[in-house]
Amino acid sequence: GMNEFFGGEISNHGIIVQGGLYNTLIRRLTNLGLADSFGNTRLPILVLNVTHPLVPDQISSFCAGKQSVLVMEEGNPEYLEQQIGQILRRADLQTKLHGKDVLPLAGEYTADVITQGLVDYLGQYDDAGIQGEALRDEAARLENVRANAQAALEEKVPPRPPGFCTGCPERPVFSAIKLLK
């Protein structure tokens, strides 16, 4: 089908992700020692290139036997997370669902946002294959990034003279007036 499955040996956890977030996710899993640069992942991933309609059998077979699954979807409300939760209940699967509990409700899921979500999600489970040290290193790095960003916000920004945007119809008139002065 249109959706892709990538298996991994850490079989009791997994990630269901919107297709557009896959590349950033795999890059961040690599940083955490959970994937390699060829896209081989140690954590099973179901990539939803088509998010509607969801295929219940596909979702339930991915989640079956897993202690937990993280649903990564941008935007609010969390349509996929709700639908997947419904599919799991109907299939009577006890897989714990994570999503907006560890990821922001709104805004773009940048690399650092995804990393923080992964750290918060995986940090709740200390079982085989998830390296606590890598998680702590990434958490510390993110804390450092936030501190540096905060410090940068407090610096004075050099003044910028007013001007018209490229493509503005008023721009040539303004330029002509400046030339006449």
Q: What annotation goes with each model-predicted range?
A:
Residues L21-T24, R28-A35, F62-K66, Q83-I87, ...:
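Generic, well-ordered alpha-helical scaffold segments in large soluble proteins
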Residues G7-L54, A91-K96, A176, L180-K181:
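Anionic-ligand anchoring segments at beta-strand to alpha-helix junctions in alpha/beta enzyme folds, i.e.
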Residues F38-A140:
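Terminal amphipathic helices with adjacent charged low-complexity linkers/tails
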Residues D36, L88, K156-P159:
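Residue-level signal for the start and early helices of compact helical domains
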